[in-house]
Amino acid sequence: MNGYASWVYYEEIFGRASRYRAFWWSPDSQRLGFYRFDNSAVPMFPIYSPFGQDGTLLQTRYPKAGEPNPSVRIGIIEARAGAQPVWADFDDSPEQYFGTPFWGADSRELYVSREPRRQSVLDLYAVSVADGSKWLEMRH
């Protein structure tokens, strides 16, 4: 799904204040950076919602420890009719997490943090809006 966060990103990475939003306008308003989530490998899990007179049992894709996470692709698209996305040069392995990205002041790069699932290192990459190529800016 484009620009709508999976449960694990909503709950654990972006936070509830994101309201599942997984897209970000460039400072010059010419492009939109977004995350595309593939939840198909994430197991379903029942979650009870107490709202309403009788409540509701909802089925949601919820990755428990050791189970698959969603795979994520990072796209950048121009804000014009017919534009095609440029995909950031990351693999779509579910064994990694991406943090909330931010734009460079000149709107030429989208900065993205990435860490492996075991969260042993944090890398900050700059991604070119022109071709999706990336380069490492910082490792922590």
Predicted regions and their residues:
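Beta-propeller fold detector
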Residues: M1-N2, V86-D89, K134-H140
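Short, surface-exposed linear patches
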Residues: R16, D54-L57, F98, L110, ...
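Loop/turn position at the start of each blade in beta-propeller repeats
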Residues: S18, N69, S93-F98, Q119
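Predominantly five- to eight-bladed beta-propeller fold
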Residues: M1-W24, R31-W87
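Long hydrophobic segments that form regular secondary structure
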Residues: A79-R80, Q84-P116, V129-D131
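Beta-strand C-termini and the immediately following turn/loop, strongest in propeller blades
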Residues: R21-W24, G33-N39, K64-P68, F102-A105, ...
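A short local loop/turn or secondary-structure capping micro-motif enriched for an aromatic residue
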Residues: N2-G3, A41-P43, P94-Q96, Q119-V121
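Conserved beta-strand and immediately adjacent loop positions that scaffold enzyme active sites
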Residues: R73, T100, D123-Y125
